[in-house]
Amino acid sequence: MSQRSSQHIVGIHYAVGPKIGEGSFGVIFEGENILHSCQAQTGSKRDSSIIMANEPVAIKFEPRHSDAPQLRDEFRAYRILNGCVGIPHAYYFGQEGMHNILIIDLLGPSLEDLFEWCGRKFSVKTTCMVAKQMIDRVRAIHDHDLIYRDIKPDNFLISQYQRISPEGKVIKSCASSSNNDPNLIYMVDFGMAKQYRDPRTKQHIPYRERKSLSGTARYMSINTHFGREQSRRDDLESLGHVFFYFLRGSLPWQGLKAPNNKLKYEKIGMTKQKLNPDDLLLNNAIPYQFATYLKYARSLKFDEDPDYDYLISLMDDALRLNDLKDDGHYDWMDLNGGKGWNIKINRRANLHGYGNPNPRVNGNTARNNVNTNSKTRNTTPVATPKQQAQNSYNKDNSKSRISSNPQSFTKQQHVLKKIEPNSKYIPETHSNLQRPIKSQSQTYDSISHTQNSPFVPYSSSKANPKRSNNEHNLPNHYTNLANKNINYQSQRNYEQENDAYSDDENDTFCSKIYKYCCCCFCCC
């Protein structure tokens, strides 16, 4: 990143490099600390992790005036989870022009990437070792009074990343906080995280029903499908679905079709409910411990404390009974003749967990919401990353953002009315979609909590049913980037005109409206 102009410097001393992803929040770039060594920005207590000069980082850009800002709450989550193993460090949060930016550790490919590179199936050994790490990460999040609410392979990344030098050589390195373990699994993208209990009193949030959906349909729990308030049990059940996905290559509820999305996701939920976990074992080709895991997660009460050690012991039992050892050797280490994954040979790591769409596009523009017409694709060079992100925001702002003007909300109301009758999932009203304007500030320290933040501790004395309609703070939908146009207007037209929907149940819900986040158009 030599000869950088001042337009490419953010946060005083972070140089913005190439774009590496895009998602529901905006756009992400690779960056570099160019000034001096510094510590993670984690509140009043400085973190022990130090980012060295010339250390690579990931820089997220998000328009400041979005309807549902994500990066501020994501930074709050990183502050809460500061010091936990497998959680990236947040080095900076602030504002640059018309954008919020968040700077965190640069990480490697997601488990979804590695899963594809390994032929869309993990061995029992790799799945057990990965499962133990994933359970540990979720336990750490729960111990800090948060629930994740969007468990999926895309949001788990390994520590080792690879970069190509100007000379064309592959440079391998690990995140600054990984202790040089290239296969340490990280959790990222806390845009849907929420406090499930008061950090001081440990009082659990109350059980509620008729909640809007949030999460990824392929992996979400049965209770989430039926509109029940999520808690720790739902994160663990979603993990169980991910484990079977790794072992089987797919899940039985993938590929279901229905006349509309409401019926499709109800059908997915009913299929999950009807199938016994033992039916997922492929005639005992999969160790029974995975069925035991899923049964246990589904048997938990709403506010019950899970036994994480028991769940990890199930994975150890599966290894032992199959004469396998947890030796740290994963399937992806055998790629390319035992040399492991390589950024030049394998598809470039797409950093799912940072929020960008799965790049596996099969040409179905209606389903994937991606305009692949070469005549309309924008290939004009962009001067700076910030201008690129701003152009994306301006395009999407004029086409698909929810307007606060009731007169311009007619089409959105039409979409909501289409799925509302006799629905177990009650969409929010237009009045509940409006978020109060938050004061803008230059640094995080002056940002105060608002009622809409999922990180406001629950207080029983102020419990209000109306608040439950507004307690989610989920990603916005505005990522038309320079080289990929995502046309949400055509998606809405498709939903209204087409009588058969795709089988892409790996969609992430925004609980405010029945509309896709752009990070969810993943092929099945």
UniProtKB/Swiss-Prot annotation:
Chain sites annotated for binding ATP: I20, G21, E22, G23, S24, F25, G26, V27, I28, K60
Catalysis performed (reactions): L-seryl-[protein] + ATP = O-phospho-L-seryl-[protein] + ADP + H(+); L-threonyl-[protein] + ATP = O-phospho-L-threonyl-[protein] + ADP + H(+)
Claim: Ribonucleoprotein is one of the keywords in the record: no
Biased composition (Polar residues): 374-413, 429-474
Principal location listed in the UniProt entry: membrane
Keyword RNA-binding assigned: no
This protein's UniProt keywords: ATP-binding, Cell membrane, Kinase, Lipoprotein, Membrane, Nucleotide-binding, Nucleus, Palmitate, Serine/threonine-protein kinase, Transferase, Vacuole
Lipidation (S-palmitoyl cysteine): C517, C518, C519, C520, C522, C523, C524
GO cellular component, one term: fungal-type vacuole
Gene3D superfamilies: Transferase(Phosphotransferase) domain 1
Subcellular location as annotated: Cell membrane; Nucleus membrane; Vacuole membrane
Membrane topology: Lipid-anchor
GO biological process: endocytosis; signal transduction; vesicle-mediated transport
Disordered, as annotated region: 352-414, 427-474
GO MF terms, alphabetically ordered: ATP binding; protein kinase activity; protein serine kinase activity; protein serine/threonine kinase activity
InterPro entries (alphabetical): CK1_Ser-Thr_kinase, Kinase-like_dom_sf, Prot_kinase_dom, Ser/Thr_kinase_AS
Active site: D150 (proton acceptor)
Short sequence motif YXXZ targeting signal: positions: 444-447
Known role: Casein kinases are operationally defined by their preferential utilization of acidic proteins such as caseins as substrates. Phosphorylates MON1, inhibiting the guanine nucleotide exchange factor activity of the MON1-CCZ1 complex, possibly by preventing its recruitment to membranes by small GTPase RAB5 homologs.
Family of the protein in this entry: Belongs to the protein kinase superfamily. CK1 Ser/Thr protein kinase family. Casein kinase I subfamily.
PANTHER family noted in UniProt: CASEIN KINASE-RELATED
Note: Present with 1320 molecules/cell in log phase SD medium.
Entry remark concerning the domains of this protein: The YXXZ (Tyr-Xaa-Xaa-Zaa, where Zaa is a hydrophobic residue) motif mediates the targeting to the lysosomal compartments.
Annotated protein name in UniProt: Casein kinase I homolog 3
Lineage: Eukaryota, Fungi, Dikarya, Ascomycota, Saccharomycotina
